UniProtKB/Swiss-Prot annotation:
Record protein name field: DEAD-box ATP-dependent RNA helicase CshA
The protein's Enzyme Commission number: 3.6.4.13
Reaction(s) the record says it catalyses: ATP + H2O = ADP + phosphate + H(+)
Gene name of this polypeptide: cshA
UniProt-annotated location(s): Cytoplasm
Domain Helicase C-terminal: 214-374
């Protein structure tokens, strides 16, 4: 394993990296950083959670001239959440060197962003639409940019941003370095690379490694009407510390979050219709453990970098292998083991096999748990709580009362009563969920078309106006 010390980084960057607690590089960092420092174009096939932000962030910070007040690097990201998280990490990497980093994205007051742009940031991290808005207004100038990063390019393709990316790149100097990161490499992404990159070096994560070996992957074949009861039984048995439940639609996310709360779970939903303030509030509560279950759509969860997620539940099967890779990549991080469970209706088995073929990874079939098994799971949790109190708490104040109880009742009956009080019995409160139609097996789309369900609905196709 390569250490950052071996990469010949500046003292300023090394000090920042040490503050962040980094010592050894990840594979994507070990391969990408030296190439980037040599000003070579790089295509990195890597998903979120592999350390790719530092892989492009460290070279960017190294190459920024802080005495030059112009924008020198541009990172394009598909979502607001990813733009914020990337900018936060770049800020940490550049803190000692005093590199100014600014995120710009839709949903935030544009006048506030204009004021921030006047403070001369060195690095811009933004979503395609908002970057174009600022270029059109003349508030963002890119003529001094020497590095462009396209982060999660496949997701920008799925969201219909390819034309926007092409327009942005046409306003960046031809003499630049371009770094492109993508979990998958569909043809439109390859064409972007051919058109806008100069003899790029490919740093590739093999397909068999794409879904991360330390994630246990299971599927459950279950009818639509029974999915919610099965989900709550799994939650009772597995008792995840932090879990993400994925739904296919915004309506599904809202209904699932409400239904989970109705049954006594601390859950909140996140999707594109929420205000930015609400989304950030939900994410903060999830990171702090105030809620134990985050219910999310694919788009809302893109790029989320939340440590400690132990379980991912695909309540609705993902529409394509790329989404599956992104979803389960929320867990199994930093060397820890994660668990991914995918619910499949009988008519969606073909889609499951399509995902398995593409990721080159078989999911293990799991039998849907029964109500009795859910109760046993909660009993195990109650026993663990009881034993923890026995081992760690001072019980002397309670022992006299315990002795009096034992004079009147046998010990087994008393312990059973304690367990009953501590056990959260499975809740069968009726809930109402709108049924989602089964997902058909994804077919290869015709050249030039868009992936199923990914037509540009959020933004119209926009061109940059000349100045």
């Amino acid at each position: 394993m390569t250490t950052f010390q071996e990469l010949g980084l500046s003292q300023e960057v090394m000090k920042a990296i040490e503050r962040m607690g980094f010592e050894e590089t990840t594979p994507i960092q070990a391969k990408t950083i030296p190439l980037s420092l040599q000003n070579k174009d790089v295509i990195g096939q890597a998903q979120t959670g592999t350390g790719k932000t530092a892989a492009f962030g460290i070279p960017i910070v190294e190459k920024v001239n802080v005495k030059n007040s112009a924008v020198q690097a541009l990172v394009v990201a598909p979502t607001r959440e990813l733009a914020i998280q990337v900018s936060e990490e770049l800020y940490k990497i550049g803190a000692v060197k005093r590199v100014r980093v600014l995120p710009i994205y839709g949903g935030q007051d544009i006048e506030r962003q204009i004021r921030a742009l006047k403070k001369h940031p060195h690095v811009i991290v933004g979503t395609p639409g908002r970057i174009i808005d600022h270029i059109n207004r003349g508030t963002l100038r890119l003529e001094h940019v020497h590095t462009v990063v396209l982060d999660e390019a496949d997701e920008m393709l799925n969201m219909g941003f390819i034309e926007d990316i092409e327009a942005i790149l046409s306003h960046v100097p031809a003499e630049r370095q371009t770094l492109l990161f993508s979990a998958t490499m569909p043809d439109p992404i390859r064409r972007i690379a051919e058109r806008f990159m100069n003899e790029p070096e490919l740093v590739k994560v093999k397909a068999k490694e794409m879904t991360v070996p330390n994630i246990q992957q299971y599927y459950l074949e279950v009818h639509e009407k029974k999915k919610f009861d099965i989900l709550t039984r799994l939650l009772d048995i597995q008792a995840p510390e932090l879990a993400i439940v994925f739904g296919r639609t915004k309506r599904r996310v809202d209904e699932l979050a409400e239904a989970l709360n109705l049954r006594g779970y601390a859950a909140e939903g996140i999707h594109g219709d929420l205000s930015q303030a609400k989304r950030l509030s939900v994410l903060r509560k999830f990171k702090e453990g105030a809620i134990e279950i985050l219910v999310a759509t694919d788009v809302a969860a893109r790029g989320l970098d939340i440590s400690g997620v132990t379980h991912v539940y695909n309540f609705d099967i993902p529409q394509d292998p790329e989404s599956y890779v992104h979803r389960i990549g929320r867990t199994g991080r930093a060397g820890k083991t994660g668990v991914a469970m995918t619910f499949v209706t009988p008519r969606e088995i073909g889609q499951l096999h399509h995902i398995e073929r593409t990721t080159k990874r078989k999911m293990e079939r799991m039998k849907p748990p029964t109500l009795d098994e859910a109760l046993e799971g909660q009993q195990r949790i109650a026993i663990e709580k009881l034993l923890n109190v026995v081992e760690t708490e001072n019980l002397s104040f309670y022992k006299r009362a315990a002795e009096e109880l034992l004079e009147e009742h046998d010990s087994v009956t008393i312990v059973a009563a304690c367990l009953k009080m501590l056990t959260r019995e499975p809740d069968t409160t009726p809930v109402q969920l709108t049924e989602e139609p089964p997902l058909a097996v994804k077919r290869e789309k015709k050249r030039g078309g868009r992936p199923d369900g990914s037509a540009r609905s959020r933004t119209k196709k926009r061109r940059i106006t000349a100045h």
